[in-house]
Amino acid sequence: MTNPLRIQQLMKLVDLTRLTDQDDADAMQLWLDKDLAGAAVLPAAVCVYPAYLAQVKSFLQQGQYAVKLATVVNFPTGTLPLAEVLEQIQHARASGADEIDCVLPYQALLSGQTEQVRQFLAAVRQASAGLSLKVIIESGELVTCQQISKATELVVESGADFVKTSTGKVKVGVTEEAARIMLAVIAASDRPVGFKASGGVRSVEFALRLVGLFEELTGNLATPDAMRLGASALLNDLSQQLDY
């Protein structure tokens, strides 16, 4: 049985995520009541589509939950015009978001448009000043180890707060191989950069392995400022383990 303190540590790393395409306010409220209000240990953040930011912000304030509010931009394909992405960030800020999860234009990176990607990241970082910025590289769509490494390097260089693996909307989410490559770049950085694993973090065992990788390769304890686990059901599964 996993040490209860380790389980609690993992729960504090979770970005409790609901990015369901067919959704409505009533379903969102039920989810908040069940998965957040019923959690034995609060997660680091709640991540929802921009349309639900105001609703979730109100819920967090009324319940006095010390939980960050996150949303997604340039999601999920990473192909929106930069001006539209900047508008999404402005809307998210006005709606009370604390954190922005932005998809890297990884298709541009795959086609060799490195400078375009660099300029995109610089603009997004400037627009999200004062907010925590997590950049999703969509590691499952990057063909080679070198591409994963390059994407991570660009995100680190941009001043983003976290490098995130996946949207959860493509076939391949986070893998241990991709995590190792990304963490090696993060560990070599001359400034603190967080790591967020998402897309397929469905089991407690896998989450434990990812946290172990983070701590092994960076030499740092996994805390919410340094690592996140993006997941929809993991928090509930971890809560159940605490009940045993």
Label the predicted regions.
Residues 201:
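Short donor-sugar binding/catalytic loops of nucleotide-sugar-dependent glycosyltransferases
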Residues 2-41, 51-195, 204-232, 240-244:
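Alpha/beta enzyme core
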Residues 198:
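Terminal helix/beta-alpha structural elements that buttress the NAD(P)+-binding lobe
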Residues 237:
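N-terminal beta-loop-helix "entrance" segment that forms/cooperates
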